[in-house]
């Protein structure tokens, strides 16, 4: 089975690229989806997050207040590392399970949609690495306008990830997403042909 890593900095359009690949029939293993699942009410990771960051990160319905957690976890490298130490081992375990299941089911290509693929050195375990690239100012603009995040928060999150240059060095294929959605779709036709 061909393992393809898909990554890009926050706001790069990586999820849009994953959706385009999924619509072409590729299996997507989504690290963000797994990250959401492991912190659902009743999951051990949620209790550990409450212990680490306080009960105020829980909504009245018992679910995780993601913005509340982000406000505490992305204040500095130490707090980000604490968040990662709780969530990343569980994400890795579930990811490995899904890859094994895909291979057992005869899947030919599995794409791992992982924001921190290069940050965590997981690019080395992939057969091919796709990096979605967008300049920082465009990423900030998109996240402020489309997700309603504050500019300061966005820049903190960007700064908590590896620099774009490091991510680009790990790329086998760079997907330029500085243009429109139509431009991205045109770029993706070439990428899909390579896969």
Swiss-Prot record:
The top EC class, named as a word, is transferase
In the Enzyme Commission scheme, what number(s) does this protein have? 2.7.1.24
| DPCK domain segment(s) | 3-195
The subcellular location is: Cytoplasm
* InterPro entries xrefs: Depp_CoAkinase (IPR001977), P-loop_NTPase (IPR027417)
> Which controlled-vocabulary keywords does the entry list?
ATP-binding, Coenzyme A biosynthesis, Cytoplasm, Kinase, Nucleotide-binding, Plasmid, Transferase
Q: Quick one: a GO biological-process term for this protein?
A: coenzyme A biosynthetic process
Sites where the protein binds ATP: 11-16
Principal location class = cytoplasm
The UniProt entry's GO CC annotations, sorted and at most eight, read: cytoplasm
Pathway it belongs to?
Cofactor biosynthesis; coenzyme A biosynthesis; CoA from (R)-pantothenate: step 5/5
Domain of life, per lineage:
Bacteria
SUPFAM superfamilies in the record: P-loop containing nucleoside triphosphate hydrolases (SSF52540)
Catalytic activity reported: 3'-dephospho-CoA + ATP = ADP + CoA + H(+)
What molecular function does GO assign, one term? ATP binding
Q: Does the keyword Glycoprotein apply?
A: no
Q: Which residues cross the membrane?
A: none
Respond yes or no to whether keyword tRNA processing is given for this record.
Answer: no
The disulfide bonds in this chain are: none
What job does the chain carry out? Answer: Catalyzes the phosphorylation of the 3'-hydroxyl group of dephosphocoenzyme A to form coenzyme A.
- Say which family it is in: Belongs to the CoaE family.
**Can you say what this protein is called?**
Dephospho-CoA kinase
**What is the scientific name of the source organism?**
Corynebacterium glutamicum (Brevibacterium saccharolyticum)
